[in-house]
Amino acid sequence: MAIRRIEGLLHLASEGRYAILVGRFNSFVVEHLLEGAIDTLKRHGVNEDNITVIHAPGAWELPIVAKKLATSNQFDAIIALGAVIRGSTPHFDFVAGECAKGLGVVALESSLPVINGVLTTDSIEQAIERSGTKAGNKGSEAALTAIEMVNLLKAI
């Protein structure tokens, strides 16, 4: 008997329904992440009618909105995008940590892929680099992960 392998593939994703949840705070970075995610989904065959963009105030609010989206049974995956940039107070640590933890809890409780595309950077320059310049576009990478996870969960 052979070992069975199950993988999520990056093939055309025309059937999937994707929610892109965007924190508006640091919008000068987040808008580029959103553009990258939408472009990647469309290039992989996702119809615009199967993409819904939801704007939340910031990264702190993303988990509760993700939970509402997950329980709506309208989506195959949620892509959470935002940017938390370190400042001179511990606020960064609380927001970044609780956002990541909350998104993970939503994914586990709902069995729905909730992709964490929230940047956590030490500087504005790092955030800009990760939103489409030197370090690629993390919004695009999050969309690829969402496609792969939708396909993987369907294959299991």
Curated annotation (Swiss-Prot):
It comes from the Bacteria. 5-amino-6-(D-ribitylamino)uracil binds at residues 25, 59-61, 83-85, 116. It is an enzyme of class 2 (transferase). The keyword NAD does not apply. Pfam families: DMRL_synthase. Gene3D superfamilies: Lumazine/riboflavin synthase (3.40.50.960). GO terms for biological process: riboflavin biosynthetic process. It catalyses: (2S)-2-hydroxy-3-oxobutyl phosphate + 5-amino-6-(D-ribitylamino)uracil = 6,7-dimethyl-8-(1-D-ribityl)lumazine + phosphate + 2 H2O + H(+). The keyword Transferase applies. The active site is at 91 (proton donor). Pathway: Cofactor biosynthesis; riboflavin biosynthesis; riboflavin from 2-hydroxy-3-oxobutyl phosphate and 5-amino-6-(D-ribitylamino)uracil: step 1/2. GO terms for molecular function: 6,7-dimethyl-8-ribityllumazine synthase activity. GO terms for cellular component: cytosol; riboflavin synthase complex. Its EC number is 2.5.1.78. Belongs to the DMRL synthase family. Catalyzes the formation of 6,7-dimethyl-8-ribityllumazine by condensation of 5-amino-6-(D-ribitylamino)uracil with 3,4-dihydroxy-2-butanone 4-phosphate. This is the penultimate step in the biosynthesis of riboflavin. Forms an icosahedral capsid composed of 60 subunits, arranged as a dodecamer of pentamers. NCBIfam families: lumazine-synth, PRK00061.1-4. This is 6,7-dimethyl-8-ribityllumazine synthase. It comes from Acinetobacter baumannii (strain ATCC 17978 / DSM 105126 / CIP 53.77 / LMG 1025 / NCDC KC755 / 5377).
